From Swiss-Prot:
Species in which this protein is naturally found: Schizosaccharomyces pombe (strain 972 / ATCC 24843)
Family of this protein: Belongs to the mitochondrial carrier (TC 2.A.29) family.
Biological function: Required for arginine biosynthesis. Transports ornithine synthesized from glutamate in the mitochondrial matrix to the cytosol, where it is converted to arginine.
Keyword Transmembrane helix listed: yes
PANTHER family (UniProt xref): CARRIER PROTEIN, PUTATIVE (AFU_ORTHOLOGUE AFUA_4G06390)-RELATED, MITOCHONDRIAL BASIC AMINO ACIDS TRANSPORTER-RELATED
Name of this protein: Mitochondrial ornithine transporter 1
Length: 297
């Protein structure tokens, strides 16, 4: 985020909105390409009963090949990259607006507002991504209900993320792209609030204790990504279940979601790996670009 650390020997560069946006754009694109296969495995574990990360990975590779783990990358990459760029820019602006507030509360409020704003635009992209990622599994489920053979799976090739969005609109209507939005909103608002607060606090304390800035960025990014994800993971699982069931024409009452069951955390292992990796990479690159102003030249 390139936020200033007051009264410390190391000075972070806050920069202009344009420099914030461009630095976040490039760093987010790189980190999301690196972490996408882990996200694909996470979604499969959340929506179908794979007992381990290994079994989920083996199933995906066996049925779809390694490229299957990158299926649906285009649309969420655009979404994640743009939303991260906008969110960092919005966050910096909100932080200035609440400059008179206690630092920790300022980080939390600014993150909360950022997540709320971004969720409105990110939901259709994420829903299309989920649709694309579990398309093969959905067809197996539907064919099993109709007692059809798996050989018919080869009739239609897997959908891309753009094809998924088009298919959702064609079959369910334009507003269907926001199915499960209340869960998405809750996840993004609370997640962003925790995310930015944890990152800012840890980064500031590490640098204050003479930790090298780049290590502070990497560690704080990994830690904020993992911890904030643990806090909102049940909501993310509920979102995936609701969206999957909508595609299967199954109603999902709030009481039917296993909030107090360990199954709500299915896929948490791969999610923590992904979140730590992506955010460590993202914040390190972001802060580096902001400090060197390499993208402004």
């Amino acid at each position: 985020m390139g936020l200033p650390v007051h009264n410390q020997p190391h000075k972070a560069h806050s920069g202009s909105p344009a420099s914030t946006f461009s630095a976040a754009l490039v760093s987010s694109a790189i980190s999301n390409v690196i972490g996408y296969p882990l996200d694909s495995i996470k979604v499969r574990q959340q929506t179908y009963n794979f007992p381990t990360i290994r079994s989920c990975f083996q199933n995906a590779v066996k049925n779809e090949g390694l490229k299957g783990l990158y299926r649906g990358l285009t649309l969420p990459l655009i979404s994640a990259t743009l939303s991260r760029s906008v969110s960092f820019t919005v966050y910096d602006s909100l932080k200035l607006t609440f400059a008179h507030v206690d630092p920790t509360l300022r980080y939390f409020i600014s993150g909360l507002g950022t997540g709320t704003f971004i969720s409105l635009f990110a939901c259709p992209f994420e829903y299309s991504k989920l649709y694309s990622q579990i398309d093969m599994l959905l067809r197996k489920t539907n064919m099993g209900r109709r007692q059809e053979t798996n050989s018919k799976l080869s009739v239609r090739p897997p959908l891309s993320s753009f094809q998924s969005a088009s298919d959702i609109v064609r079959r369910y209507g334009f507003t269907a792209l926001w199915n499960g939005y209340r869960y998405h909103l809750t996840r993004d608002a609370l997640g962003s609030a925790c995310y930015f607060t944890i990152y800012e606090t840890f980064k500031k304390n590490l640098i204050a204790n003479d930790v090298k800035p780049h290590f502070a960025y990497a560690f704080s990014g990994a830690f904020c990504g993992a911890l904030s994800w643990i806090l909102v993971f049940p909501v993310d699982t509920a979102k995936s279940i609701v969206q999957r069931n909508t595609l299967l024409s199954i109603k999902t009452p709030l009481s039917s979601i296993p909030w107090l069951s360990f199954t709500i955390y299915r896929g948490i292992g791969i999610s923590l790996m992904r979140s730590a990796l992506i955010n460590s990479c993202n914040f390190t690159l972001f802060e580096l670009f902001r400090e060197t102003k390499v993208l402004s030249k």
